[in-house]
Amino acid sequence: MQQKYNIYVIIVTYNAMQWIDKCIGSLQHSTVPLQVVVIDNGSTDENTAYIRTHYPDVTLLAQTQNLGFGQGNNVGIRYALAQGATHLLLLNQDAWIEPDMVQQLLPYDDGNSLLSPIHLTGEGDRLDKNFKEHALMRAEHFEQLVDDWAVGKTHKYATYEINAACWLLPEKIIREIGGFNPMFFHYAEDINYLHRLHYHHRGVYFVPQAKAYHDRANIAQKPLNEQYMYQQMVLRMININDSWCIANARKWRFVLSILRAAIRKRQFSYLPMLSNALKCIGRITQEAKTNRYTQQQIASHWI
């Protein structure tokens, strides 16, 4: 099995010192050999110097500016494909893996599907909240999943949404679907990628026997801001599983939800942010239409 695969791990970092040893250290203990590529998005801490000193076998692609999560990953994916990667393991800077995680995933690789482990919290004592609410609870055949899990059966389970903290992607998917969409800087780019996978009838699965950890429980939740509003509207507008008419209806439904929240919570500071986000949306309507067409085509977009 180990000779058959050439797996590159892509990690995008920005001021990642608090996690870097757990993240990269876990990869060094993998039962399947992994090539590690770090794309640093212009960190202002000691991240790049530390990696160069303590992890000389890691390929470090240091950027002079913050490209964002998606475009940083695209830099790494482009590099890995040029080196002959058969698979890409996208791993968050605040995530780490069990030694046998990749080994547990590979038997379920069909060349056409995204595979993910289950995501535990950084403490490892419970499921990550996002994973539980979106991947697990939206899994197909949920009752069968519970039965299988209880008696120790091993399967993969289809679901609609898994955040990109730990994704295993075969080269074929990248060649046919492409990289992350440049219309997103940070957040929502993984949801857009899942929309594209579903549109093109590619699988999205998780394997309960494979485990990764995502340490975000202690990260303070950011307040609602203009960038979030803008990206949520873009996400709805360019979802190719919806017609243009329905996509715009979903965008306006989101706008109404913000207005209701502003009134209910008496957070009237939302209103100028929403107004500015809508102005930005008005300027990218044609770009959104063109982007939708691009996503519908089979090609290695943005790589």
Task: Show the residue positions of the predicted features.
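A conserved acidic beta->alpha catalytic loop
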Residues: 26, 40-48, 65, 95
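Conserved donor NDP-sugar-binding/catalytic core segment of glycosyltransferases
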Residues: 98-130
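Short, flexible, basic/aromatic active-site loop/helix in glycosyltransferases
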Residues: 135-159
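Short, acidic, metal-binding catalytic loop of nucleotide-sugar glycosyltransferases
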Residues: 25-34
